[in-house]
Every structure is written in C-alpha cells, then in structure tokens.
Design a protein with these regions (language model features):
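Conserved flavin/dinucleotide-binding core of flavoenzymes
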Residues: 80
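Conserved helicase motor core of P-loop NTPases
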Residues: 3-77, 88
C-alpha cells in the first residue's frame, strides 16, 4: 500500500513504465473530497496536460490531449455512457471539439459538451464493465461510507495486469473487514406473487 500523495506519481508514469493516459486508470470510491474523482481530475490534468488552449464550460476545462468520458448515451453522435476518448482538437471560434474514441473521431458542438467529463480518474461505480491494463485506487478513511469489500473487489478486478492501492492502510483494512452488504427491500417477491 502506497502513501496517498503517490497516486499522481504513479499515474504520471514516474514509477510505471507505461503511458499514463492510455494504459492506466485511476478509480476513486467517491466524486468529492481530497481523493475524489473531481479533485483527482483537476490535479492529473494539470500534471499530464500542460497545454493552455482550452474550452471552459461550467466548472470544466477541456484541452487537446485530455482523457474524457461520455456521461450519457448520445445516439446522434454514436457515443454511449462510459465511452472514454482523447480530445484531438479544440475550436475556440465555435466552442466545438473532436474526440477520438478508439480511432473514431466524434465532433462535439458546444451544447454536447455537458455530457463530457475529464476521465483521468473515474468512479469505481462508473468503471463497472470496463477493464484497463493498470488501475490505481486511492483509499482514505474519508471514504468510510463507501469502504465495502465488494467495492474494493470491483475496483481491483478492473485491472488486467495490475491493481495499485494508494492511501491509508487502515482504510483498506476497514473495507476488507466490511462484509455487510445492505439488504434490499424491494417487495419484488410480493409483486411477483400478485401477478
């Protein structure tokens, strides 16, 4: 288990011999907080992408070379929730940009940008169904509400070659010890018997 400040060092490739954008993925338990998705994306963007030309929209800033994720199905563009790509070009005149989704270029108009987010870090929940060569998982006690064994299992199994857990060893221990899964009360049995 590594110290939490090492998450960026691992991700930017100082310790891993791989491309930090295309060959690894940071998976965070939560969106908010010091090691949440939002903060990690800001930090990682500043370290990995020093370009200055950008489109700013709301609280987001998009630059050529940024790793981004589609957050909603868009059938008109042919991109779907969870698709990850790299920004190829930015047009400052009309606020559009092009994203490469595995060798398929998609043009986003300014109104479509609300469905994009930085993807240097994504939530563990969002990563379900995806795989990456290497995953880096920051764990802190601040995530106590989310620290469940099944969450750690989900995160670790996203990595094909390696999973690196960064953070507080006590937080990891909390998660591993926590085997209580919340019982769902849906009334499904009763509804099926009525049908």
């Amino acid at each position: 288990m590594y110290k939490r400040q090492e998450v960026c060092e691992h991700f930017v490739g100082r310790r891993l011999a791989l491309d930090p954008v295309s060959q690894s993925q940071v998976l965070a338990p939560m969106h908010r907080g010091e090691s949440g998705v939002a903060n990690l994306n800001r930090i990682l963007q500043s370290r990995l992408n020093r370009r200055t030309t950008s489109i700013k929209l709301g609280g987001s800033e998009f630059k050529v070379g940024d790793k981004v994720i589609q957050n909603r199905n868009n059938y008109d563009l042919g991109v779907f929730n969870g698709d990850i790509g790299i920004i190829e070009s930015v047009n400052l005149e009309d606020g559009s940009l092009n994203v490469d989704f595995e060798r398929r270029s998609v043009q986003y108009q300014k109104t479509d940008l609300f469905d994009l987010a930085l993807a240097y870090a994504v939530s563990i929940h969002k990563s379900q169904g995806s795989e990456y060569p290497v995953v880096i998982i920051p764990l802190l006690k601040a995530h106590f509400m989310m620290l469940q064994r099944n969450l750690i299992y989900t995160a670790v199994t996203r990595g094909r070659k390696k999973a690196i857990i960064v953070g507080d060893p006590a937080a990891f221990a909390m998660a591993v010890r926590s085997s209580e899964s919340k019982t769902r009360r849906t009334l499904l049995k009763e509804r099926l018997s009525e049908a």
